[in-house]
């Protein structure tokens, strides 16, 4: 049964995991995450230099912890994997160098993993993972995309955000409302007691040059502007803002847009399976309404397990095992890191003459 030691350091979460491929599917033998949220919260967002330093401090302890829990040594792994793109370059370098060093010392293959491919693989950690073809809504702090996963043709992007990702919009609106960082959980908490219908907010659409709109694309910049104007108008009338209602109205409109366009994309492609992954996929309102409306429209909705929605190393291990199982082999030990790399070109990470 193939086993990998997987590392994740693409942003502000240091993580390590041991993942095994068994007869019943993927099994997470151990996983640990060291979050830096509290440290970055005072700055209102991630500070790259701080993130890199904390990865250096945390990663060795995390690796020791998961190996101890799994009762295994690095020498018993079939491979070592680490996220190498996209992300903060300094942060990525910590995980990549650590992974490549361990692989070289123990004579194991190294697999450089695309961060978005890892998110896509997170649904394979569910008890009953879906089978391709299906549409994936990848919705996180840095990405909002609709992706077709097909066993024959691979990955094809069908829709994307043209400005902020949904998670980034949550962070910025939370800051506008004076709520904590990260914005997703803060807005969700405030929205519980709010009226989601109190404020009318726009559903951003992206115009085609030839007329009409891109049906599966997203834009959240107009929504942010509308929230800013709403807050300014309310402050002109009173010092006390109806934070719960503002949070609920914002959360609801984002959920409406994500649900409507995702299900439409799925049905337009003649598919009956939709997968949702990424940090924002942990949002309760989004999970409930996606499943509910999916049932009403004949679409089976598969959600990444909550523990593996936000950045983690188990999903990196899942992606690496998927590549091994598909016969992609390993990455070059000379593979570096890159702040950006197309998801569709993820196979380039396994070339023996690396492009970065």
Swiss-Prot record:
GO annotation (BP), single: tRNA threonylcarbamoyladenosine modification
Residues binding Fe cation: 115, 119, 311
CDD domains: ASKHA_NBD_TsaD_bac (cd24133)
EC number annotated for this UniProt entry: 2.3.1.234
EC class name: transferase
Tagged with keyword Acyltransferase: yes
Coiled coil: none
Cofactor or coenzyme needed: Fe(2+)
Disulphide-bridged cysteine pairs: none
UniProt-recorded Gene Ontology molecular function terms: iron ion binding; N(6)-L-threonylcarbamoyladenine synthase activity
Subcellular location: Cytoplasm
Chief site of localization: cytoplasm
Residues at which substrate binds: 138-142, 171, 184, 283
GO cellular component: cytoplasm
Cofactor binding description: Binds 1 Fe(2+) ion per subunit.
Catalytic activity: L-threonylcarbamoyladenylate + adenosine(37) in tRNA = N(6)-L-threonylcarbamoyladenosine(37) in tRNA + AMP + H(+)
Annotated Gene3D superfamilies: 3.30.420.40
Keyword hit for Transferase: yes
Family statement: Belongs to the KAE1 / TsaD family.
Chain's role: Required for the formation of a threonylcarbamoyl group on adenosine at position 37 (t(6)A37) in tRNAs that read codons beginning with adenine. Is involved in the transfer of the threonylcarbamoyl moiety of threonylcarbamoyl-AMP (TC-AMP) to the N6 group of A37, together with TsaE and TsaB. TsaD likely plays a direct catalytic role in this reaction.
Name by which UniProt lists this protein: tRNA N6-adenosine threonylcarbamoyltransferase
This protein's encoding gene: tsaD
